[in-house]
Amino acid sequence: MSSNPSRSNSRSKNGDLESGLKFVDNDHDSKDIEARNRNHFYGFRAEPIYDQTERLANQVAELQEQQKRLFGPSGADFEPNIHRLRYINYGNPAPFGLSAFAFTTFLLSLFNVNAGHVKVSNMVTAPAAFYGGLAQLLASMWEMASGNTFGGAVFGSYGCFWLSYASIFIPWFNIQNSYDDPNDFNYAIGLYLICWFIFTFLVLLCTVRSTLAFFSLFMSLDVCFLLLACAFLRTSDGSPNVVLIRVGGAFGIFSACAAWYNAMAGLATIENSFFTVPRAIFPWSLEGLGPEEANRRRMMADDK
């Protein structure tokens, strides 16, 4: 029996059409699989690479723009004059150093004003060595790395002050026990404090055009050193002058509070607090001058 040629031709055409459709479907499926694999590959990443590059470029441009800006005196940055933003890749070390200084100074000053009628002040030895001393040395190194010469010199110096003060009362160093006469020991302590009074006065001269809190910190600290030095130089019966010790302790408490105030100015921001610490800028500072004079001096500092 002969086959119908028209039916066979139609059957062959239908077969070719089905194979063509299968080929198209297979090609379409392969593209879907490739797209899914590509999405799966990039799914492990937070964002495409070109978005990361654009975001990084914007951050670099913003940091470069901040480097060009000049900021006024600030105790929060431990900067007594106009300065550029330096701590770009890490945080501001000034609040850490200021807090270490404030804590140790406040504790010793409480003993000096006879708070709680504590007779022996050796409790301050450990904080003086590890918080007031070591912490301020670390803050000094970070300030130096960020380009803040003032902060590095001051934090490093007072860190060494607390380390040396603690070593005086540590028996292993045998400093206090080496004096047979208590009056000689007290007089030596007085000379030691006079040296720190001179250094603090030099630092004070660098803050006369900054802020009120910044200037008050070193002004009260300088008076504290002077009164304590006079107390140890004017000894009676082997003991320092009690009245001068207590008055010096009061100035030390005020200095510690001023240091905490400046530290809080660097910690409290609009992102983490409901308030920010105000800056009381002296009218004779750069920020207190007129806009034209301030811009002129900023341009001069920028040229330097």
UniProtKB/Swiss-Prot annotation:
Keywords: Endoplasmic reticulum, Golgi apparatus, Meiosis, Membrane, Transmembrane, Transmembrane helix, Vacuole. GO terms for cellular component: endoplasmic reticulum membrane; fungal-type vacuole membrane; Golgi apparatus; Golgi cisterna membrane; plasma membrane. InterPro entries: AceTr, Gpr1/Fun34/SatP-like, GPR1_FUN34_YAAH. Its main location: endoplasmic reticulum. Residues 1-12 have a biased composition (Low complexity). It is found in: Endoplasmic reticulum membrane; Golgi apparatus, Golgi stack membrane; Vacuole membrane. The keyword Transmembrane applies. Signal peptide: none annotated. It comes from the Eukaryota. The chain crosses the membrane at residues 93-113, 123-143, 150-170, 188-208, 212-232, 247-267. GO terms for biological process: meiotic cell cycle; plasma membrane acetate transport. It is a multi-pass membrane protein. GO terms for molecular function: acetate transmembrane transporter activity. PROSITE patterns: GPR1_FUN34_YAAH (PS01114). Residues 1-23 are annotated as: Disordered. Belongs to the acetate uptake transporter (AceTr) (TC 2.A.96) family. Has a role in meiosis. NCBIfam families: AceTr_1 (NF038013). This is Meiotically up-regulated gene 86 protein.
